[in-house]
């Protein structure tokens, strides 16, 4: 480290160098999420053309060479010379940060690409990028590459290899962008077909009548190569799709309005489930963290249904209103806002911050819902939802009393989790870990083998409830979940507060068999339904205990999957001993520490949510009440012909 610090140490990153230096600031990460965010940035631009009425078809193609191509039949990026910079507008868009046509509503009424950095960021982080523009019967093309400066040895990001050129005549119109992510930037440059396809399908739902085509040229099976999506019902079709594996108890409520320059689109459908699922978007961009539009929607739902319940006498004059949670139980909703100047929190656009959106969005939703509920045609539906909410309120009140009793009991007992939780001595939550361990036997080994300075152990005695099939009061009555909730310290549901989390890592440690997998699924379902922020903030992990121990003399190799076993046997050589672990309890404390708990050598799998809608559907299918969808899913993805591909070890083999 330098001993002096002066003006000469201040670096000025010019052009796209800043993007390559700190890619996470622009796309979130250099892992899978950031890699796919590159596609979304280009697709957002194509979507903006469609959302503003200029494009009718958008294609996304994953090429065999690892590149991605996005095409629309919109107006095409302007090809004339920029008056200030003296180069084509295409070159400006792809080489200048904060350059674009979306900073006012002259060219786009609604846009997800307000920041003006999407196209240039993708260029900066690509090995190469080619733009084709079809405009005024002319085909234009320009190529950019991230090259190495022969003088300095530094990488020049997104360098134009030549000016924009006319390469032919055409009757086509629109823009085509093809880019190949740079392996010098990303941990892995392989695009996952399912992630891209699901997002393309989602965009088709959000853009009624626009045709989307997704092609994966890498796919071996013809039926997995090309997918076309076009939905004339728009978000009404979307909520039906989201509830495919649930039991809907109403038809969708759908309304749309334009007021004060704000576009409001909402679709609601109720099911017989106990959880709510609200998916919000702004200008086609998902807002998984919500924002002012989602808050406005929830407020309007609460007021509209409470007012209606009072009008029909379901809530008496002296009785308190029901909570919003009561009216949203079993609700699936798609909430869409078209905002002229959206203010997102960060370039990855997780939350809408425009304060002016809330009063307008709320007023529209309240007005539309009130009219709907008062319509004589909808009385049966409206009364059914009110009755469902009243039942939910009773359950919520019972749950509240149960929590108060539990808190009072905990306050009276010096150590409410004695005999269950083995706490760590460290007081810094950001350094501490909680292992949720299957069974008392493994729990005992984990307690002995752990580093008690920062590792706490919570053994699970028996199998917890499948919360997908239970109400909140039933969840709180389960001893295993009560212990877990108390240990974490965050509360659950509407009372969840992540700032009170006592452990930075929550690690599920179960056997590598069917029972262990079921326990993992049950715990993940609980976290997803009642502590989702624990997952989205990256605190939940799955421990990976070894399947095999191969040893000879003083040399030992642990194998964490079947594929690693042959190499381990070859490395150890003749005369080895082989042990297969069927459960955590078969390992002594030292082995459990060495293989599964020691931060220097263990393997952990972090649990993330890449696609909220797909995660919800899979939890519903695998953990819900309907048998047929689960059987269909298992039939499609489980390999019943799989056999152990190892043979008994004989003395001659050794």
Question: Where are the language model's segments positioned?
Answer:
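Short conserved segment of the HATPase_c
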Residues: 77-100
């Amino acid at each position: 480290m330098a001993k002096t610090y002066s003006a000469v140490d201040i670096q000025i990153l010019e052009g796209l160098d800043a993007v390559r230096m700190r890619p996470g600031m622009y796309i979130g990460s250099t892992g899978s999420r950031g890699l796919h965010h590159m596609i979304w940035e280009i697709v957002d631009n194509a979507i903006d053309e469609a959302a503003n009425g200029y494009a009718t078809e958008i294609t996304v193609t994953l090429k065999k060479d690892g590149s991605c191509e996005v095409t629309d039949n919109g107006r095409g990026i302007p090809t004339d010379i920029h008056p200030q910079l003296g180069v084509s507008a295409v070159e400006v868009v792809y080489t200048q940060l904060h350059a674009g046509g979306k900073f006012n509503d002259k060219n786009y009424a609604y846009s997800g690409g307000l920041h003006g950095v999407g196209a240039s960021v993708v260029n900066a982080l690509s090995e190469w990028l080619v733009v084709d523009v079809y405009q005024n019967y002319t085909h234009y093309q320009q190529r950019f590459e991230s090259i190495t400066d022969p003088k300095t040895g530094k990488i020049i990001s997104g360098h134009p290899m030549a000016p924009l050129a006319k390469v032919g005549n055409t009757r086509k119109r629109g823009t085509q962008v093809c880019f190949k992510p740079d392996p010098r930037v990303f941990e892995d440059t392989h695009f996952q077909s399912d992630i891209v396809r699901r997002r393309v399908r989602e965009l088709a739902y959000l853009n009624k009548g626009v045709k989307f085509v997704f092609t994966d040229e890498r796919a071996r099976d013809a039926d997995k190569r090309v997918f076309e999506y076009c939905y004339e019902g728009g978000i009404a079709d979307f909520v039906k799709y989201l509830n495919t594996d649930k039991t809907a108890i109403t038809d969708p409520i759908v309304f749309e309005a334009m007021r004060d320059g704000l576009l409001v689109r909402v679709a609601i459908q109720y099911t017989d489930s106990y959880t709510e699922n609200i998916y919000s978007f702004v200008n086609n961009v998902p807002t998984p963290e919500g924002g002012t539009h989602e808050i406005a929607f929830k407020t309007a739902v609460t007021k509209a249904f409470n007012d209606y319940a009072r009008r029909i006498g379901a809530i008496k004059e002296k009785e308190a209103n029901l909570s919003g949670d009561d009216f949203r139980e079993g609700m699936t909703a798609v909430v869409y806002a078209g905002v002229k100047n959206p203010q997102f929190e960060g370039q990855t656009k997780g939350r809408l911050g425009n304060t002016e959106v809330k009063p307008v969005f709320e007023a529209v939703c309240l007005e539309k819902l009130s009219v709907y509920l008062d319509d004589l045609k909808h009385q049966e539906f409206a009364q059914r939802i009110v009755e469902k909410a009243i039942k939910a309120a009773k359950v919520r009140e019972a749950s509240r009393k149960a929590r108060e009793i539990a808190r009072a009991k905990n306050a009276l007992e010096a150590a409410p989790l004695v005999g269950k939780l083995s706490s760590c001595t460290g007081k810094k939550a950001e350094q501490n870990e909680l292992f949720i361990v299957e069974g008392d036997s493994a729990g005992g080994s984990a307690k002995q083998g752990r580093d008690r300075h920062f590792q706490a152990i919570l053994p699970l005695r028996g199998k917890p409830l499948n919360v997908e099939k239970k109400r909140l009061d039933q969840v709180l009555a389960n001893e295993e979940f009560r212990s877990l909730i108390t240990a974490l310290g965050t509360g659950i549901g509407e009372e969840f507060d992540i700032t009170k989390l006592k452990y930075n890592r929550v690690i599920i440690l179960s056997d590598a068999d069917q029972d262990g997998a079921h326990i993992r699924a049950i715990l993940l379902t609980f976290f997803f339904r009642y502590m989702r922020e624990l997952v989205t903030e990256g605190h939940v992990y799955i421990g990976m205990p070894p399947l095999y121990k191969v040893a000879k003399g003083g040399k030992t190799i642990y194998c964490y999957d079947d594929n690693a076993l042959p190499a381990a046997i070859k490395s150890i050589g003749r005369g080895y001993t082989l042990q297969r672990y069927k459960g955590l309890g078969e390992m002594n404390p030292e082995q459990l520490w060495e293989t599964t708990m020691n931060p220097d050598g263990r393997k952990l799998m972090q649990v993330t949510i890449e696609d909220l809608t797909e995660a919800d559907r899979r939890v519903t299918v695998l953990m819900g009440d309907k048998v047929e969808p689960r059987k269909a899913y298992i039939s499609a993805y489980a390999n019943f012909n799989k056999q152990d591909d190892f043979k008994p070890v004989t003395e001659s083999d050794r």
